A protein has these predicted regions:
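Catalytic active-site module of serine/aspartate enzymes centered on a nucleophile-bearing elbow/loop
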Residues: 238-296, 301-308
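N-terminal cap/lid segment of alpha/beta-hydrolase-fold proteins
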Residues: 1-19
Length: 308
């Protein structure tokens, strides 16, 4: 079911709700990567729903079907959009166990949400620090330097937005692109406009956290992933750095885990882990209907799409 949900500040955010035929009492929010439309995660979300989870995916402001706000920044994504969706997830499963799955940026911003501590578990896929020094010396590091200092500032100034085709994503609003580049230039990565680190609620991430990265991912190399780990000092982290063979496939990269071609055993492993961890909370959900904006759109089944 496709919905249009209100953020805390009134911004309208497009979302998709995947409802299980046989609920297991658990609900999952999916935080997407930078510039990745929620439909890209549809097959994965539907698989989790088939396993009994309520799943909510959404587009950050300025992207996909969400309200096109030109002044949107990454701070808005983490401090308003994300906690708003956690609120909606709580409305779906007020007495149930709840988790977040973060892809790339979606795992970097957990500590920006003032209600992140209301969740019971998290899974991070390819989440890393984007600071350029964490890339191996040589051509790959030079590309990151060019992205943060030249490509994003230059193209954003020229076009009024960042053409996402340069990095394989959707176009980014100018404010989002500029804040992303600011983060990438800072050794703190997630930082405010003055360059100070933003870690307002990172200590509240004090639950089981499964963190996966892949040997063939050029966008989240091992050093960059490990650099993000200190952001969550109170989490019970389970780290997995896997080769594609470990998942029964030839390639994963930065986006492949969520593609329809991913062997279902990899998705089942995530579902099994979530079930085991969330069951330990001892909470059982009674599903409730989520409230949408008056001009919400809905369809009998959520659409799914593959990005490549």
């Amino acid at each position: 079911m496709d919905l249009l949900l209100a953020a805390r500040d009134g911004a309208k955010l497009a979302a998709s709700l995947f409802e299980p035929a046989t609920p297991n009492g658990h609900a999952v929010l999916l935080n997407s990567g930078t510039g990745i439309p929620r439909q890209f995660y549809g097959a994965f979300a539907r698989h989790l729903a088939d396993r009994g989870f309520i799943v909510l995916t959404y587009d950050y402001r300025g992207l996909g079907g969400s309200e096109k706000l030109r002044d949107a920044t990454m701070e808005h994504w983490g401090r308003i959009d994300q906690p708003s969706m956690i609120d909606h997830l709580a409305a779906l499963a007020p007495d149930g166990s709840r988790a977040v799955i973060g892809h790339s940026l979606g795992g970097q911003i957990l500590g920006l949400a003032d209600n992140i501590g209301s969740l019971d578990a998290a899974v991070l896929i390819c989440s890393q620090s984007g600071h350029w020094r964490h890339w191996p010396a040589g051509r790959r590091r030079l590309r990151m330097l060019a992205l943060w200092w030249l490509l994003i500032p230059g193209l954003t100034a020229l076009t009024g937005h960042f053409p996402g085709a340069w990095v394989g994503t959707a176009d980014l609003p100018s404010g989002v692109a500029r804040s992303w580049a600011r983060w990438g230039r800072s050794r703190y990565y997630v930082c405010d406009a003055q360059g100070a680190p933003l870690r307002p609620h990172n200590a509240d991430v004090a639950f089981p956290l499964r963190w996966m990265s892949f040997t063939d991912d050029p966008i989240a190399p091992l050093g960059a992933v490990e650099a993000l780990r200190p952001y969550y000092p109170n989490a019970a982290v389970e780290r997995l750095h896997l080769a594609p063979d470990d998942l029964g496939t030839d390639a994963v990269g930065h986006f492949g885990f969520f593609r329809k071609s991913m062997p279902r055993r990899a998705w089942d492993e995530i579902a099994d882990w979530l079930e085991n961890r969330l069951r330990q909370t001892g909470r059982i959900s009674s599903s409730k209907e989520i409230s949408a904006c008056p001009n919400h759109t809905s369809s009998p089944k959520s659409k799914t799409a593959s990005a490549g």
